[in-house]
Amino acid sequence: MFVPLVHRCFHNLIKILEYIEPFIRDEINTDEDAYLWMKALFEDMNPIDKDSDAFRYPFKIEIRKDEVWGDKQYTIKKFFEGQKHINLIAFANKMEIIFDILCSYYENKKKRYEEYKKYNTVFLEEGGEYYCQSVIGYDYSKAFYGPMVKGYSESAEYLGDLIIGDSKLKETYFFPMCYLYRNALELELKQIWFEECAFGFQERCKKLSKSKHSFEKLWNMINEDLIRHSQGEGDKSVITYAERYILQINALDSSSSVFRYPVNKYGRYHFVKNKYVDARNVGEFFKEISEFLQCVDMMMDDHNQCLADMAAEYADYY
């Protein structure tokens, strides 16, 4: 059952729901209206995020062939067209209701629901109090990666603090913490490549598209520019250590799925045997790499700005 599910449905929630519906029909029959409400919300979500990328990355890269020469041309497409002020309270409450419904199906519980009746089936509903809104749909800018890096890394750090404060929470929050940190690191590597490295737009898009989720590929893409911006042997030594850490993560999770799902696309567990790890140490490991990459981005941005200012000043003489 699992392999056909993955290959037919991937991340598409509507397809997944329709695939499993025959197996949870008894639970659905207990409150079919709640099921139909949830399904309608998934249908509204699907055009926005059927590939599960819209909230992980700031944009996607589209490829088309030049009609005359047949060459591939790369363009950036935003996930959200037009600015929207999202009602975060309504969004969070809808998600909580959906989780409750799905958990009852998973646990074979036959329950009825009332809370969903307070909400419509619009996925990203606008409105609400001013301080309870999130604005999405900004035009692409050079600093577009920054807020996503901050959001993922600070969320991971928050879960890490919960684990340290209460060891009973390790089983619950360890993998989410690792996934959030891993995605933050991927965003940081892509930010350095796309915003600071000395390549043209088409080349940056092409290599970014091919790198997918591989830390090794992303690191190799930025390494030459990073060394060029580094200052002295001390910096190069730090870069060497950072490279070892980054390649360790890549060896464990090159596809960004090990911390995201318990099994791979063939239904096999990522970790077959029990492993005892130091959760605090793992959190600090991720955090230090994240801070290193953020410093790299700031250093390269500062250098590039200085070079641009010098070039502009030099051009004034001619």
Placement of each model-derived feature along the sequence:
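Domain-scale activation on soluble regions of proteins
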Residues: F2-Y318
